[in-house]
């Protein structure tokens, strides 16, 4: 639904044709399920988050210790395209760093260089990097180097306009980051309200940062990768057992665990 949406005028009929043959559809969040229902999809739709294998991800950063002291760093890892709202990120970053002189802000990418389909954003980002030494752009990171960033930073920031769960939030919380995310799209389903800011509002975003920093509590966010790993296992369970009753791991975590334990115990 996400990337093919602009092609819906000719592709939707093809998708609905496949829908008639499918015994189930996996999506990350309830809002995605609702959008598919509105578009005419009739197959069972299971909300299973994204298929994160927590153990495999943790193995990529064997030095990670959740008890280690963390640095006063905000990490931003989303693409710099329009749907991620990067100009807003830059505005927030500049204001945040002005208010918090003991903090740094890292923008990361695994690419050899930063890319964007949004005109002007790369120039604006590098201009901010020149005038604000605590705003740092980091490119060509390996997965291990990225995970090392997450395991030492305190907060992952997001400004996306259309994410369905988001890999950034799952990987960040797996490695102990707290989060500041927009109260938008799929995020309110699983992120606590006190970590969500009013979309497009810089002042409210800064207040949310202040609250998250002051509380210093990421116990709620540690649940995200656990539930997502559970969702990955539920995908296998649903396929293996031809399970046609719709499941939502965000809402039925205990029931999903029960089904998996029941299967394991025979």
Name each region found by the language model.
Residues 3-25:
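Membrane-proximal helix-turn-helix segments that form the acceptor-binding/catalytic region
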Residues 31-32, 47-59, 112:
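Short beta-strand->alpha-helix junction loop in the catalytic core
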Residues 65-84, 90-95, 106:
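Conserved donor-binding/catalytic core segment of Leloir-type glycosyltransferases
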Residues 104-122, 139:
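Glycosyltransferase donor-sugar binding loop
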Residues 119-141:
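Nucleotide-activated donor-binding/catalytic signature segment of Leloir-type glycosyltransferases, i.e.
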Residues 160-161:
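Aromatic "clamp/platform" in nucleotide-sugar-dependent glycosyltransferases that forms part
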Residues 194-203, 212-216:
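Conserved acidic donor-binding segment of nucleotide-sugar-dependent glycosyltransferases
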Residues 214-264:
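A charged, aromatic-enriched C-terminal amphipathic alpha-helix characteristic of glycosyltransferases
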């Amino acid at each position: 639904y996400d990337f093919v949406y602009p092609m819906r005028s000719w592709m939707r009929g093809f998708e609905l044709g496949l829908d008639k043959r499918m015994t189930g559809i996996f999506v990350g969040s309830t809002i995605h399920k609702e959008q598919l229902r509105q578009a005419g999809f009739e197959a069972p739709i299971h909300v299973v988050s994204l298929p994160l294998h927590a153990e495999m991800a943790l193995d990529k950063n064997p030095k990670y210790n959740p008890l280690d002291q963390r640095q006063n760093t905000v990490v931003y890892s989303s693409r710099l395209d329009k749907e991620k709202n990067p100009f807003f990120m830059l505005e927030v970053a500049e204001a945040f760093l002005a208010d918090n002189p003991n903090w740094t802000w890292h923008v990361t990418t695994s690419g050899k260089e930063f890319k964007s389909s949004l005109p002007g954003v790369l120039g604006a980002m590098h201009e901010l990097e020149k005038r604000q030494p605590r705003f740092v752009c980091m490119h060509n990171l390996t997965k291990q180097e990225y995970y090392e960033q997450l395991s030492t930073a305190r907060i992952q920031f997001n400004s996306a306009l259309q994410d369905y769960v988001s890999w950034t939030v799952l990987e960040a919380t797996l490695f102990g980051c707290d989060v500041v995310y927009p109260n938008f799209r799929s995020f309110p389903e699983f992120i606590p309200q006190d970590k969500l800011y009013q979309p497009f509002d810089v002042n409210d975003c800064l207040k949310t940062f202040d609250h998250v920093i002051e509380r210093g509590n990421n116990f709620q966010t540690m649940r995200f990768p656990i539930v997502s790993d559970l969702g990955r296992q539920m995908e296998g369970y649903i396929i293996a057992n031809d399970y046609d009753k719709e499941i939502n791991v965000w809402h039925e975590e205990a029931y999903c665990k029960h089904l998996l334990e029941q299967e394991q115990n025979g």
